[in-house]
Amino acid sequence: MPRIVNPLDEMLFKEVLKEQQRIRVYTERARYGKIKTIIEGIDEKEFDLEEIAKKLKAKLACGGTAKNGRIELQGDHRDRIKKLLVELGFSEELIEVE
């Protein structure tokens, strides 16, 4: 018999998971000397990285992708990314910006 999950319980569980994610934000040099911002530490099994990347790209007006368990955004967005991740429900104390 399949287990019936209350949608409210599932939402609360996801909120708790968001508050426990240790997230690291840093930059890397891409091709031709371009900079890209990397976001690591979001559990791709629990959260849709593509959806999070889509929201961040829209807010930051940049390109990017979600691959290999991390989000890559074109350009240096370290100064704004922490605030945006907090708006998405992640805990500010667990976001490390380098």
UniProtKB/Swiss-Prot annotation:
Keywords: Protein biosynthesis, Translation regulation. Disulfide bonds: none annotated. The keyword Transmembrane helix does not apply. GO terms for biological process: formation of translation preinitiation complex; regulation of translation; translation reinitiation. GO terms for molecular function: mRNA binding; translation initiation factor activity. The keyword Zinc-finger does not apply. It holds the Pfam family SUI1. NCBIfam families: PRK00939.1, SUI1_rel. Belongs to the SUI1 family. This is Protein translation factor SUI1 homolog. It comes from Pyrococcus furiosus (strain ATCC 43587 / DSM 3638 / JCM 8422 / Vc1).
